From Swiss-Prot:
Family affiliation: Belongs to the ADP-ribosylglycohydrolase family.
GO terms, molecular function: ADP-ribosylarginine hydrolase activity; magnesium ion binding
InterPro entries: ADP-ribosylarg_hydro, ADP-ribosylglycohydrolase, Ribosyl_crysJ1, Ribosyl_crysJ1_sf
Listed GO biological process terms: cardiac chamber ballooning; cardiac myofibril assembly; protein de-ADP-ribosylation
Functional description taken from the UniProt entry: Required for myofibril assembly and outgrowth of the cardiac chambers in the developing heart. Appears to be catalytically inactive, showing no activity against O-acetyl-ADP-ribose.
Identification of the protein by name: Inactive ADP-ribosyltransferase ARH2
Location of the protein in the cell: Cytoplasm, Myofibril, Sarcomere
Organism: Homo sapiens (Human)
């Protein structure tokens, strides 16, 4: 249970750390961000208070997803209606938090009063952003057991396409939910990318079954898989026989900026549903159990560092708990008690059959 609580908390910590960078327009390069952090005394001396270190829309939407998942729904359609209600309820809080534009657009299309079609939104050519990935980690907490894979796939796809009805967007939510479930299962980190790609055809099959936007999806489906396959080959972990990620000899903050931009589809690392989880995963592979190193790689770069920080922080919490993280980063965190309560509730529900 403690690690589930840590996952919810540290996702929010990663969000707050990364969001502060996104807000500082002048700090657009990882090297500069890290130098600034050192001048202020480093991570050990930071206290994340809500006034100084607010969370972004990533945490607000993640909390909304978790709240829906911890209600007493008796079928998945009821869960989706509850998600719609939660998202519509909090959407007015989002504009001041610099949200992924597709999140706002998607929430505007939700129909809480339409019982049958509440969560059916139109295909969105611009719905490929990171916002689906950053609100879905808790789905992996709720359905982490291997025998719940089918449910995890369905819920993460539906949750994702409520706001990001585009394969690059909603496959991001599948990816983060799967990574969280793999962490909870104790699966070796180096296998996660391969096993996630093996689940993508199951998501495609589910989308075909639900007969929504199949033609539009087909056109964009390949992009997500191709980007991830390329990444796994670059790190030499695409085959089952490969069990150690290989990094370049020189992979400092400046080189990482270039690499993150290369992975992106528009030159801003972490902007889309494929590369926000990718940067977080890359950071976890390189950082091991070092929270500081994780922050340098996932929370302090010139791209969408709030998105990558949210995903990386959540996964780190589930893998390693809170012991390796300075207390000041979470003791006064915005919505701390709510996040801990949701983590505990998700743990309890995930261990009961439903």
């Amino acid at each position: 249970m403690e690690k589930f609580k840590a996952a919810m908390l540290l996702g929010s910590v990663g969000d707050a750390l990364g969001y502060r960078n996104v807000c500082k327009e002048n700090s657009t390069v990882g090297m500069k961000i890290q130098e600034e952090l050192q001048r202020s005394g480093g991570l050990d001396h930071l206290v994340l208070s809500p006034g100084e270190w607010p969370v972004s829309d990533n945490t607000i939407m993640h909390i909304a997803t978790a709240e829906a998942l911890t209600t007493d729904y008796w079928c998945l359609d009821d869960l989706y209606r509850e998600m719609v209600r939660c998202y519509v309820e909090i959407v007015e809080k989002l504009p001041e938090r610099r949200p992924d534009p597709a999140t706002i657009e998607g929430c505007a299309q939700l129909k809480p009063n339409n019982y049958l079609l509440a969560w059916h939104t139109p295909f969105n050519e611009k719905g490929s952003g990171f916002g689906a990935a950053t609100k879905a980690m808790c789905i992996g907490l709720r359905y982490w057991k291997p025998e719940r894979l089918e449910t995890l796939i369905e819920v993460s796809v539906e949750c994702g396409r409520m706001t990001h009805n585009h394969p690059t967007g909603f496959l991001g939510s599948l990816c983060t939910a799967l990574f969280v479930s793999f962490a909870a299962q104790g699966k070796p980190l180096v296998q996660w990318g391969r096993d996630m790609l093996r689940a993508v055809p199951l998501a495609e099959e589910y989308c075909r079954k639900t007969i929504r936007h199949t033609a539009e999806y087909q056109e964009h489906w390949f992009y997500f898989e191709a980007k991830w396959q390329f990444y796994l080959e670059e790190r030499k972990i695409s085959k089952d026989s490969e069990n150690k990620a290989i990094f370049p000899d020189n992979y400092d903050a400046e080189e990482r900026e270039k690499t993150y931009r290369k992975w992106s589809s528009e030159g801003r690392g972490g902007r889309r549903g494929h590369d926000a989880p990718m940067i977080a995963y890359d950071a976890l592979l390189a950082a091991g159990n070092s929270w500081t190193e994780l922050c340098h790689r996932a929370m302090f770069h010139g791209g969408e560092s709030a998105a990558t920080g949210t995903i990386a922080g959540c996964l780190f919490g589930l893998l390693y708990g809170l012991d390796l993280v300075p207390k000041g980063l979470y003791q006064d965190l915005e919505d701390k008690e709510k996040l801990e309560d949701l983590g505990a509730a998700l743990y309890r529900l995930s261990t009961e059959e439903k």
